[in-house]
Amino acid sequence: MKVLLIKDVKALGKAGEIKEVKDGYGQNFLIAKGFAKAATNEVLRKYESDKKKEAENLRFEIANLEKLKEELSKITLEISKPVGANGSLFGGVTKDEIAHALKEQSHIEIDKKSLECDTFKSLGLHEVSVKLGHAIHAKFNINIKAE
């Protein structure tokens, strides 16, 4: 009997592969436990259709991330912080403050966990890197000014 593997099965194959197995193994174990489906024409057509939809969604998501990367590259955030008499910042600028400023000034919401930078402790222009997903990284600038 031919089965379409839904999940990876050790010593048999990976999800998405079509395998020839003995009837008892296919019916009583693979299909019963949810590891596979009988490889009928209908199941194969649905699997191919789902695979195409998934690929299209991935292309759409990557295109949106590339657009976001382009938008972010044009941004320079302005952040004002109190400074001491010697010109050093009190505390510094954290990822949380950068994410909040990005949302307030550019209306782009990014999780602070995806920002790749340390706390900035000096005035001036700094570059911030962002992990957007699917191996796409963006960079934007922040300008830290004295209050």
Curated annotation (Swiss-Prot):
Q: Which family does it belong to?
A: Belongs to the bacterial ribosomal protein bL9 family.
Matching Pfam families: Ribosomal_L9_C, Ribosomal_L9_N
Keyword Nucleotide-binding in record: no
Q: Which InterPro entries match?
A: Ribosomal_bL9, Ribosomal_bL9/RNase_H1_N, Ribosomal_bL9_bac/chp, Ribosomal_bL9_C, Ribosomal_bL9_C_sf, Ribosomal_bL9_N, Ribosomal_bL9_N_sf
Lineage at the top is: Bacteria, Pseudomonadati, Campylobacterota, Epsilonproteobacteria, Campylobacterales
Q: What is this protein called?
A: Large ribosomal subunit protein bL9
According to its UniProt entry, the protein's GO biological process terms are: translation
Tell me where on the tree of life, at the top rank, the source sits. Bacteria
Keywords (alphabetical) are: Ribonucleoprotein, Ribosomal protein, RNA-binding, rRNA-binding
Give GO cellular component annotations, separated by semicolons.
ribonucleoprotein complex; ribosome
What Gene3D superfamilies does this protein's entry cite?
Answer: Ribosomal protein L9, C-terminal domain (3.10.430.100), Ribosomal protein L9, N-terminal domain (3.40.5.10)
What the protein does comes down to: Binds to the 23S rRNA.
Gene Ontology terms, MF aspect: rRNA binding; structural constituent of ribosome
